[in-house]
Amino acid sequence: MLRGRSLSVTSLGGLPAWEAERLPVEDLLLFEVSWEVTNKVGGICTVIQSKAKTTANEWGENYFLIGPYFEHNVKTQVEPCEPANDAVRKAVDAMNKHGCQVHFGRWLIEGSPYVVLFDISSSVWNLDRWKGDFWEACGVGIPHDDREANDMLIFGSLTAWFLKEVTDHADGKHVIAQFHEWQAGTGLILSRARKLPIATIFTTHATLLGRYLCAANIDFYNQLDKFNIDKEAGERQIYHRYCMERASVHCAHVFTTVSEITAIEADHMLKRKPDVVTPNGLNVKKFSAVHEFQNLHATYKARIQDFVRGHFYGHLDFDLEKTLFLFIAGRYEFSNKGADIFLESLSRLNFLLRMHKSNVTVVVFFIMPAKTNNFNVETLKGQAVRKQLWDTVHCMKEKFGKKLYDGLLRGEIPDMNSILDRDDLTIMKRAIFSTQRHSLPPVTTHNMIDDSTDPILSTIRRIGLFNNRTDRVKVILHPEFLSSTSPLLPMDYEEFVRGCHLGVFPSYYEPWGYTPAECTVMGIPSVTTNLSGFGCFMQEHVADPTAYGIYIVDRRFRSPDDSCNQLTQFLYGFCKQSRRQRIIQRNRTERLSDLLDWRYLGRYYQHARHLTLSRAFPDKFHLEPTSPPTTDGFKYPRPSSVPPSPSGSQTSSPQSSDVENEGDEDERYDEEEEAERDRLNIKSPFSLNHIPKGKKKLHGEYKN
């Protein structure tokens, strides 16, 4: 029986030590297989890329990623090199000799993990034979007209072939292979059918059928136990893909999902309860100075304010210092991403702010890529007018400053009328004239191709948010991903997020949700739901998420209208906060980032690997069926200082204020003291062998 050394897994201040039996990684090889290795398609690439550094630090030269070869990606992301591992080198050479093009190198990301990349196009001639092998292995046929499924079969067949070559030359080393999503699942199915001596893990980040059903506006979560799965998959012509996914799940030694809500979904859709929930993390970079992220917020907020000045020229009758910037970002899935409920709540928020005569203005950005043909002319003109006005003012400032300087040298206080001559007044009048506008500021920065049928624009027309002067809520649709080279809003996504006040992501279908997690790590409050993995994670392990800047909308047990009202109240409460309260809240939000660090959450992947070894090689590896660290009944406590919103304070004014309250509540707040208390209060969020609530642990769970 192989036994490793005891390892204390805690590299973060305040997080509890986790005494785990360390795997003998020097005697193991770890492979992670995904279609998104060096090939960004969606969020799985973010998972693998962000986790690579932590995993590479743990496994060293025995960690490899397997993915597809695309020349345009490899040229900029991969540094070719020769495999140092003897078994991997022999496997690559053997496959190349048989006509397969296998590329090896280091992925140029943090951790620099090794990558093995298969050129799918070089092996297309094997497709018919491999289809026959796959049919014999699991009885699933793949249509000729499904190009994606055919590519996945080639990729999986090459993966199984490669793993066979590796195990033939492994010299006693045990192999772990983790497969992400159904695209990589064919390799798992074929490996198990051929009885390769490898320990397998299958991870689903979202079920295939779940995405299709939610996109069709079906009451998904309340109907989970009522769906005829085979019928639903057949009607959508994805039955063969569903069978590939389900076979992968049932062939794996260990099945994992990224969140508890996805675990419940997978139990119904794929008919197997996940063995381990492995939450997604991020690489958290701490600043040396405590307030540095607050300074970055001020810097990038000023750049967003510059854009707003140009976009709303001629209608800039609101105070930018009392303006809040909200945003929603992600794929253009109108219902799944919650853009529908967000727009409706903005209409209600606009009514509340106007009714209470609030002097707070809310500018909302929709960063969702859609089909466009060019920039909006009015938007470009606005930025040009702003820049021209800025240059004019700078010229006048230099002239004004020289006259003031000369007057003070003479010991005189200059007469303002003598400082500004007729030419200056003419220039100022021309500048004012150039800012006149006879149309409303546009609600979109680009010309939309499907303007009349676009869901966001159609909803804006229905609710009447046209950026009128009387509207306290202004809307801007930016149908492109952000870029620092853009002539309109020259900012990267991270810079833009840091400059905003609140991210709003009221998703209906979100297996994890990286966008609110990224906000948390950057110290920006966010809105999420109890149907997202991130929302469930925070709701379960933080006593008062709102106090820490995590607003969780109930979209599972409330009607759509009630959920919309709840979101509206969250937004209205946020608008009522003073500047000091927002600063305090951002400090608390940033402190939650430790919970999302891969150095902390990576332990659940470690447990999954240990579990699969104990099931695949029970005579060599054993996992003690003892309860890992758990926090039953514990939650990250509510802060004891000033409340995050005025609901419990002395004033009930809906207006934001720059004047700080001097009451006892404010005096009780000591940032360093509270930060230290928070660090000591962070606990392990859930049991390593986590089983979804309401599900009993299967007998012999730790046995093969």
Curated annotation (Swiss-Prot):
Chain positions covered by the region annotation Disordered: 620-704
Residue sites binding UDP per the record: 40, 331, 515
Species name: Rattus norvegicus
Expression sites by tissue: Specifically expressed in liver (at protein level).
Name of the featured protein: Glycogen [starch] synthase, liver
EC number: 2.4.1.11
Chain intervals with Low complexity compositional bias: 647-657
Record CDD domains: GT3_GSY2-like
Chain sites annotated for binding alpha-D-glucose 6-phosphate: 291-292, 294, 297, 301, 501, 582, 586
Assigned keywords, A-Z: Allosteric enzyme, Glycogen biosynthesis, Glycosyltransferase, Phosphoprotein, Transferase
Activity regulation description: Allosteric activation by glucose-6-phosphate. Phosphorylation reduces the activity towards UDP-glucose. When in the non-phosphorylated state, glycogen synthase does not require glucose-6-phosphate as an allosteric activator; when phosphorylated it does.
Gene: Gys2
Residue ranges, compositional bias (Acidic residues): 659-675
Self-association state and partner proteins as the record states: Part of the glycogen synthase (GS)-glycogenin complex, a heterooctamer composed of a tetramer of GS and 2 dimers of glycogenin, where each GS protomer binds to one glycogenin subunit (via glycogenin C-terminus); the GS tetramer may dissociate from glycogenin dimers to continue glycogen polymerization on its own. May also form a heterooctamer complex with GYG1 (via GYG1 C-terminus).
GO-annotated molecular function: alpha-1,4-glucan glucosyltransferase (UDP-glucose donor) activity; D-glucose binding
Entry's pH dependence statement: Optimum pH is 7.5-8.5 (at 25 degrees Celsius) (non-phosphorylated state). Optimum pH is 8.5 (at 25 degrees Celsius) (most phosphorylated state).
Pfam hit, one: Glycogen_syn
Protein's job: Glycogen synthase participates in the glycogen biosynthetic process along with glycogenin and glycogen branching enzyme. Extends the primer composed of a few glucose units formed by glycogenin by adding new glucose units to it. In this context, glycogen synthase transfers the glycosyl residue from UDP-Glc to the non-reducing end of alpha-1,4-glucan.
